[in-house]
Amino acid sequence: MTKPFILLVPGSFAPETIYASTIAHLRTLGFPAVALRLPTTTKRMPLPAATMAEDADVIKRSVEAVLATGQEVVVVCHSYGGTPTTQALGELGEKKGVRRVVYLSAIIPRVGESNNDAMGGKKGELAFEMTEGYMHIDATTFAPAVCNDLSWDLAYEHTLNLAHHSGASFLEPATQAGYLDIPVSYIFCEKDMVVTPEKQSGFIDVVKEATGKEVHVVKLDAGHCPNWSMPEKLGDVIAEMAGM
């Protein structure tokens, strides 16, 4: 069987480069794979900060581009990335060829909910300031919250890569729900302090209630970013899900 193309959608604040080790491992396993760059993580002065809908458009067009080559695709979305991915896959006119969506400790909004709504108006353990439409991270505080499964020095070095994210994107509601008619898997991070286990269980229930189907779940003994703490193990789990 031909292996599907894996598109990885980053979380908030996250450049595509933070998934490089996992992407490289997937390629060694024979999967074509790439992490996307979201507009909401890119400052583009004098234009305003990008919206969630703009992220969804990038995801949708990327999926369509892969499908146009005749390949099947699996979309893996991390954290905030679950919100625009849910929107993007719902907007697809043709879903044949989208083999699966994999939510990696990700937010799954109901139709009408924003990222913040889905999180109950909370932002986990994140500490940031808002300037000129962008949220900015305090890496000193952020590191132990996101990388609680790494030593503080490594966590700090990693989180220096997380610069800024559009504030507006957290407030825009989803109008589509791609999980309604695409098979769903969830990578559950048991030590996550940002999207907590309680929240992750709630998001899995959102899909169950909306579809009447069970969700395939794999648990990792990891914090919010297994792409840093266990990149190859994460790649192995994604590969397993992509082969379903």
Swiss-Prot record:
Pathway: Secondary metabolite biosynthesis
InterPro entries listed in its UniProt record: AB_hydrolase_1, AB_hydrolase_fold, Sec-Metab_Biosynth_Hydrolase
A GO molecular function held by the record: hydrolase activity
Entry-linked Pfam families: Abhydrolase_6
Domain of life: Eukaryota
Residue spans crossing the bilayer: none
Keyword Signal annotated: yes
Residues bearing glycans: 227
UniProt keyword annotations, A-Z: Glycoprotein, Hydrolase, Signal
Induction remarks: Expression is induced on squalestatin S1-producing YMG medium.
Function: Probable hydrolase; part of the gene cluster that mediates the biosynthesis of squalestatin S1 (SQS1, also known as zaragozic acid A), a lead compound for the treatment of hyper-cholesterolemia by targeting squalene synthase (SS). Both phenylalanine and benzoic acid are known precursors of SQS1 and so it is unsurprising that the cluster also contains genes potentially involved in benzoate production such as phenyl-alanine ammonia lysase (PAL) M7, which catalyzes the first step in the degradation of phenylalanine, or the NADP-dependent dehydrogenase M3.
Name this protein carries in UniProt: Probable hydrolase R7
Organism of provenance: Phoma sp. (strain ATCC 20986 / MF5453)
Lineage: Eukaryota, Fungi, Dikarya, Ascomycota, Pezizomycotina
